[in-house]
Design a protein with these regions (language model features):
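Hydrophobic/aromatic side-chain positions at a characteristic register within alpha-helices
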Residues: 72, 84-88, 122, 159, ...
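Helix-turn-helix repeat elements of alpha-solenoid scaffolds
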Residues: 53-55, 82-98, 121-135, 163-176, ...
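Solenoid-like repeat scaffolds
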Residues: 64-70, 98-108, 135-144, 172-188, ...
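Cytosolic juxtamembrane N-terminal segments of multi-pass membrane proteins
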Residues: 1-23
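Transmembrane alpha-helices and immediately adjacent membrane-cytoplasm interface residues
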Residues: 54-85
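Long, non-transmembrane cytosolic or organellar matrix-exposed soluble domains/tails
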Residues: 207, 211-281
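"A position-specific structural signal for the A-helix of alpha-solenoid helical repeats
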Residues: 78-79, 109-116, 146-156, 160, ...
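Canonical alpha-helical transmembrane segments of integral membrane proteins
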Residues: 26-44
């Protein structure tokens, strides 16, 4: 993906510097438009040319002009997720987000940064640190997408730390949240989260056939490289358990090649070494 390439082979400082440069340019453009709007309105009111209808019309025009710029700013922020999702580099991702805390000081932005940082820490294998960041964020009023992200982070971290009781508590929280959704689109998103949790628990219990069936059905829809890498590592685990060593080796080699700094790569190297030993033995 071309957009993800812009973050490759760059230090966190370079990425944030470029991000700030683009952000300041867009913010400057908004300020310029606002000043122009104020000057035109003052002139119109002062000379008595503008009535209330004219003022409201100009306000609507202002909103229409600045809205795409605000969307552009939001897109720039969201595009940083490509460092994690496409470049599979949670280490750089976390460092970038730490630097961004000094750029975005508004509460809403700070909470979004911390949730994303917790995800980066999780994919770096720093599960206790991710939980330390994620748990306090539950007290905030979050968008549905961020609520789902937070539930996913907490569930995965507790499961990886083998705290099944807390993982199941998080799953119950997810079920309660999903049951409250009215919109069909939110219900689908919520159900997908529950399916991911069910599949993960099936793998954890050693129910390999159930996991394979669920994961193969989902993996056809994966677009992010991170999803593909994590999927093939889990499927390799299933392949090994089922004696399908050739498939397992193919999956593991792909994960090592594409997995970047994801914590699963370390597990993958260990699994591949054990598999090679089996073949030689």
């Amino acid at each position: 993906m071309k957009a993800a390439m812009q973050y490759q082979n760059k230090t966190p400082e370079e990425i944030v510097r470029q991000y700030k440069k683009r952000l300041r340019a867009k913010q400057g453009l908004i300020i310029l438009i606002l000043l122009l709007h104020i000057i035109i309105n003052i002139r119109g009111i002062w000379w008595g040319d503008d009535g209330m209808a004219d003022v409201l019309l100009k306000l609507l025009i202002l909103i229409a002009v600045t809205f795409p710029i605000n969307v552009w700013i939001s897109w720039d922020f969201m595009s940083l997720n490509l460092i994690l999702n496409q470049n599979c580099d949670p280490v750089t991702y976390v460092q970038v987000l730490c630097l961004l805390e000094k750029v975005h000081k508004r509460k809403r932005s700070a909470v979004a940064i911390r949730i994303n940082e917790a995800a980066g820490l999780m994919w770096s294998g720093q599960f206790s640190d991710a939980l330390a960041l994620a748990e306090p964020l539950r007290k905030y009023k979050l968008s549905v997408n961020y609520q789902i992200s937070l539930l996913n982070i907490r569930f995965n971290c507790y499961k990886k730390m083998e705290d099944l009781e807390r993982a199941m508590q998080v799953k119950h929280e997810a079920e309660v949240l999903v049951s409250s959704f009215k919109k069909a689109s939110l219900q689908r998103t919520g159900q997908e989260l529950l399916n991911v949790m069910d599949a993960s628990l099936a793998l954890w219990r050693g129910d390999h056939e159930t996991y394979r069936r669920m994961e193969e059905a989902r993996s056809a829809r994966y677009t992010a490289k991170l999803q593909k890498v994590v999927s093939v590592v889990c499927l390799a685990d299933v392949d090994i358990a089922c004696g399908e060593l050739k498939n397992a080796k193919t999956h593991l080699e792909y994960a090592i090649q594409e997995g970047g700094t994801l914590y699963v790569v370390e597990d993958t190297r260990r699994m591949l070494a054990e598999l090679t030993q089996k073949e030689q033995g």
